[in-house]
A protein has these predicted regions:
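N-terminal periplasmic accessory domains that precede
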Residues: 86-92, 130-133, 151-154, 183, ...
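Gram-negative outer-membrane beta-barrel transporters
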Residues: 526, 682-821
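C-terminal beta-signal and adjacent terminal beta-strands/loops
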Residues: 205-209, 665-667, 809-857, 864-923
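Face-selective signature of the C-terminal outer-membrane beta-barrel domain
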Residues: 328-347, 365-546, 721-723
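Structural signature of Gram-negative outer-membrane beta-barrels, strongest in the C-terminal barrel
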Residues: 505-655, 659-663
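Short acidic/polar hinge/loop motifs at secondary-structure boundaries
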Residues: 58-61, 172, 187-239
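Extracytoplasmic beta-strand/coil segments of soluble accessory domains associated
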Residues: 131, 135-207
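Short, acidic, small-residue-rich periplasmic hinge/interaction motif at the N-terminus
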Residues: 27-31, 38-43, 72-76, 84-123
């Protein structure tokens, strides 16, 4: 008996020892090369799994000889075999699978209109940032990278244009990009507390210009896509239609970014083109043999020159990401997953003048953006229960932003520098010589976010319901020092209306939302119905009671419907047709800058005495300062009303989709002019001399009209258009698919509220704008059209591990016209009493008021059309063995750009080819 027990214990020990040390190797059956990253699982168990290492070897624990294992790898046929210790397993390539690498955006199949861009498409596209992916959307087109300015997003619109169809920037319509929400692994990238700008920019202005300060400023403009690298991204979904009520604080659309969370070999990427150099490293580690504990690490660096011949202006980006994933299950009763990530993103703009051509002086603009983010999420799924899912997401992020500007200020004769912080008459400083001004904007935007969601499900006789209920809260606060500079040496001596401001004194912004949604699926005969209907309630917590939004909730109802008709045969192949439609309201809350703008200091010159004998000592300058608070306590959220209809057709591996959409927003944010009456003294400078008290001089009381900028809901955007996408089956003799995307966009950019407009005409020696300013109820904007297509020939030769795509991008038409204006004001404000008065026929008899009536030539409102243009782009990807991938792209290798006439001038267009090469390594 004792011998029997000993024998059994010995056998058990041998089995356990064997189970702990079983190894194997996986290679390519044709090349005999090791396959890195192949998945090896014990068949019938998800807990026992591993991946092959750099040598193709793997180790399985808790497994015995003869157990059936499954070996799988992308592009190879899966292999189910008995497991033998030390054996070598050969995988055969799956040519069909290799030929189906998706290198374009995939259209959505559900009721919500969206496009999904996968990892393979990103690899083939060779992007510098997520901005480059937008060319894959319907209506998108390839652009040369411009890292010298913020890359903001526009969805389903033409973008603002100039008189001759050129792209412009316009602060009045920045809601387009501000209203696009970017989500990374379920948490948003918030820019609400970003106040990083220069007083020389047009941030708090209704005007826009292409200056250094404006091009790189993203305050109130949303996410700068330059800062988002694609190297650690698994997929990007761009929702252009009506999103689920789960997503809010948006108007235009949604960009959902999913990071890589799986075991992958060490990958390296090197890219170089005419503008940029890029490098990245990434690795996904399986921390246990079961493969359910994963650690992903990524690093990236990019250095871009705005002009390859100019070393004085560049942009740099540094990114790092550490992501942990843990999955578990309990006999299919519940599945859970915990995700955690620590991400760093740094963007660095640097521009300075060449001292050799700037008289030895250096003007410099440096802007740095460093974001640290800690995210956590927990997802619990209970497939067997009516309570299906619990999902919790959290985020804590801090940005360290610094904008430093050095500027040479050279007054013509003298410059007046007001120093007063309060209302009243004060002596001002004068500067008589050039000086170097230094400006610092120190921002520390902080954001915290919590979202909790529950999913329930139940069935009836004919329907299946999935109910989603949840809430989210976020807080945005800026703890920075704000605008720091020497008031005696401002960045400008011309109309300086700013003062230093501490951002940490600004209250926090808190958004709270609650949502509920039912996703119903039903069978009606042979047809299938999908109905997604829900509502989202939005409010701002902790807002001062002086604001009209305080305590108010704004409801966003949204509905999406998909009707899948019965399949029928065409040519012996089944055809499926679905009709989709939706309607919804989306809401974007104001940012910190819109709620708490900088004060405006209006300065009126009471006396400017310049002493010719001793100017620096005896000159005297007096100003009357008015401190304006531009806060609009009646500001409201921007709300967009959207509806669309879409037709999807699938037949024999061919897919066609076309949709028509219309969006209307009349409450977009913009800064508008506010006019009022200002009184000040004008001293008789002719009697002034050194040592005289200026208050004893005779003076004249003056009253003028002047204005400042206040945020309002005065922007109107109306979008409509048609989007189409077609993907053919692969033509096997050519190894090619044909992908066609295109769009017609018609967009109106105008105002939704009457606006003041001043006239500078002089009558009887008096400027009209000082006496009267008209209020006009006109359309001060443009109406734009754009029609373009992108035909891509996707050719893949799996045996050669070669993919090349040729895209023919045609811009068939760009048209723009100024909207007709009624030049007759509806009212005017008078300097006599500061009140609004109706503008009547009798007003035309007054020589001053007559000037307020504008007349326009009909030629101003004629449409201008830019003729058709075409470019051809080429991209090639070649795998070399198991470890290396080479890619090449050449944009605009062929072009058709005919000349055209604009305002009597011949415009000659030309295109400079843009080349780049990339090497990828898998180790």
């Amino acid at each position: 008996m004792r011998r029997t027990v000993s024998t059994l214990l010995l056998l058990l020990f041998m089995v356990m020892a064997e189970a702990q040390n079983l190894t194997g190797k996986v290679i390519d059956s044709k090349t005999q090369e090791a396959i890195i990253g192949a998945t090896v699982t014990l068949k019938g168990s998800k807990k026992i799994a591993t991946v092959t290492d750099i040598n193709g070897q793997f180790r399985l624990s808790n497994t015995t000889e003869g157990s059936i294992i499954r070996i799988s790898y992308v592009g190879y046929k899966s292999l189910d075999v008995p497991f033998h210790n030390g054996a070598t397993y050969r995988l055969c390539q799956d040519v069909a699978a290799l030929g189906e690498v998706v290198v374009t955006a995939r259209a959505s199949n559900g009721p919500v209109t969206s496009s999904v861009i996968g990892r393979d498409a990103m690899t083939h596209l060779q992007p510098n940032s997520i901005a480059d992916l937008m060319e894959l959307l319907p209506g998108g087109y390839a652009k040369d990278p411009n890292m010298g300015e913020a890359n903001t997003i526009t969805l389903r619109e033409t973008g603002t244009m100039g008189a001759y169809g050129s792209t412009t920037k316009n602060n009045n319509y920045s809601i387009s990009s501000l209203g696009t929400q970017f989500m990374v692994d379920g948490v948003p990238i918030s820019t609400d507390a970003n106040m990083q700008y220069s007083p020389l920019s047009d941030t708090q202005s209704s005007t826009s210009s292409s200056t250094l300060e404006n091009n790189r400023n993203i305050t109130n403009r949303g996410v700068d896509m330059r800062s988002i690298s694609t190297d650690d991204i698994e997929s990007v979904e761009v929702v252009r239609g009506i999103p689920s009520v789960e997503y809010g604080n948006l108007t235009s659309g949604l960009v959902k970014i999913k990071k890589i969370r799986r075991a992958i070999p060490l990958t390296a990427r090197f890219k170089a083109d005419g503008y940029s150099k890029l490098f990245s490293l990434g690795k996904g580690l399986a921390l246990n043999s079961a493969g359910n504990s994963i650690l992903n690490v990524d690093l990236g660096y990019m250095d871009s020159k705005i002009d390859p011949t100019d070393n004085f202006e560049n942009y740099k980006r540094v990114t790092g990401s550490l992501r942990y994933t843990l999955r578990g299950e309990n006999d299919k009763k519940y599945l859970w997953q915990y995700n955690s990530a620590f991400d760093y993103s740094g963007s660095f703009d640097d521009s300075k003048s060449d001292p050799d051509i700037n008289y030895g002086n250096v003007e410099e603009y440096k802007s740095s953006f460093s974001r640290l983010a800690l995210t956590n999420s927990f997802n619990l799924k209970m497939p067997m229960s009516w309570f299906k899912e619990v999902d919790v997401n959290t985020l804590v992020s801090l940005q360290l932003d610094r904008l430093h500007q050095t500027r040479l200020v050279a007054p013509q004769r003298y410059g007046i520098v007001p120093l007063s912080w309060t209302d009243g008459e004060n002596e001002a400083q004068a500067v008589f010589a050039e000086y170097t001004a230094n400006y610092l904007c120190d921002g520390k935007p902080f954001n915290a976010y919590v979202k909790a969601k529950g999913v329930m499900g139940f069935k009836t006789t004919h329907t299946v319901h999935t109910i989603k209920i949840g809430a989210n809260w976020d807080i945005a606060k800026n703890f920075g020092r704000g605008q720091v500079y020497d008031m005696h040496r401002p960045l400008s001596v011309s109309g300086w209306s700013s003062r230093p401001r501490k951002y940490s004194d600004i209250p926090a912004l808190q958004n709270f939302s609650f949502f509920a949604e039912d996703f119903m699926k039903a069978n009606i005969g042979m047809s299938k119905i999908e109905l997604m209907a829900g509502v989202r309630l939005n409010t701002l917590l902790g807002l001062d009671s002086k604001y009209g939004m305080s305590g108010k909730y704004y409801a966003d109802p949204r509905v999406n419907l998909a009707w899948h008709f019965p399949k029928f045969d065409v040519g012996g192949k089944p055809m499926s047709i679905s009709l989709n439609g939706g309607y919804g309201i989306t809401t974007k809350m104001p940012t910190l800058n819109y709620l708490y703008p900088d004060k405006y200091y209006s300065n009126f010159i009471c006396m400017a005495y310049y002493d010719t004998e001793n100017p620096t000592q005896d000159s005297k300058f007096v100003v009357h300062t008015y401190v304006q608070d531009p806060t609009n306590y009646q500001i409201k959220p921007a709300r967009n009303y959207k509806w669309e209809i879409r037709l999807d057709v699938d037949w024999n591996d061919n897919r066609f989709s076309v949709d028509y959409f219309r969006e209307s927003m009349t409450s977009g944010f913009r800064y508008s002019s506010i006019y009022g009456v200002y009184d000040y003294r004008s001293y008789d400078v002719s009697q002034m001399k050194a040592g005289v008290d200026y208050t004893t001089l005779p003076y004249e009381n003056r009253r003028v009209l002047d204005g400042y900028q206040q945020v309002s809901n005065g922007s109107k955007l109306v979008k409509q258009g048609i989007e189409l996408a077609f993907t053919s089956q692969r033509i096997h003799c050519l190894r090619t698919r044909v992908n066609v995307t295109g769009a017609w966009f018609h967009t109106q950019y105008t105002n939704s509220q009457p606006m003041f407009d001043a006239v500078s005409t002089v009558v009887n020696g008096q400027t009209v704008r000082n006496k009267y300013v008209g209020l006009y109820d006109w359309n001060d904007g443009r109406e734009n059209d754009r029609l373009n297509t992108n035909v891509t020939f996707d050719t893949q030769i799996p045996e050669w591990k070669l993919i090349f795509t040729t895209s023919v991008q045609c811009m068939w038409m760009i048209r723009t016209k100024q909207m007709k204006k009624n030049g007759m004001p509806i009212a005017y404000i008078s300097s006599e009493d500061g009140q609004l008065h109706d503008y009547t026929d009798e007003s035309l008899n007054d020589p001053y008021l007559l000037q307020l009536a504008r007349t326009y030539n009909d030629e101003q409102f004629k449409a201008f059309t830019v003729p058709m243009s075409m470019v051809v782009n080429l991209k090639v990807t070649k795998e070399i063995g198991r470890y290396m991938r080479l890619s090449f792209f050449a944009n605009k290798i062929l072009d058709y750009l005919p000349d055209y006439t604009a305002n009597g001038r011949v415009i000659r267009r030309n295109a400079s080819p843009y080349f780049g090469v990339e090497a990828g390594f898998t180790i």
